[in-house]
Amino acid sequence: SHGDYTMNDASLDIVHAATDYGDYDALMDEYLSCIKMTDAAVQELCDYFTAQYEKTGRKVIVAMAGDHAPSFVGHVADPSFAETDNELQILERSTPFFIWANSPLEHTAAATSTTDPLNRMDMVMLTPTLLQQAGLPLSDYYEYLLEMKHNTPVVTAANDYMKVDGSTAETKFITFQEL
């Protein structure tokens, strides 16, 4: 999402957007092509670690995530998906993530939301969730974050947050003088 998606010759794009994005067509084609190639590389990586586990028993966990949608998302996304500015912030700052292991994880239920079908969490929550799923010890701070995740799984740098039910709000800061 930080890339300059106009670097390659357009003939190298392996994916072409079905939707007309106007001035952003070439950008979308390269961005989507990068996603397609990344997907194939991740599959190759997972296949490699699966084979390593079968040969050696070495356990590996892979976590992949982004910290926000690409910078051009505001030009190509349909804003009607968000009812409020807070919800739009959450959507724009959300990206898919996954945690994969080449062996069974024992604590996966703790990482799954029972109220949010998209199972969203922010980047701060990813590390303690990964450690928890791996069955590794957690610091007091990570324990605190996991407890917080039960009520507020997403907090953005723009002070927007998402409650466990998927509703969004904005944190209001007041100055000492306003008290």
Where are these regions (language model features)?
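Solvent-exposed soluble domains appended to multi-pass membrane proteins
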Residues: 1-179
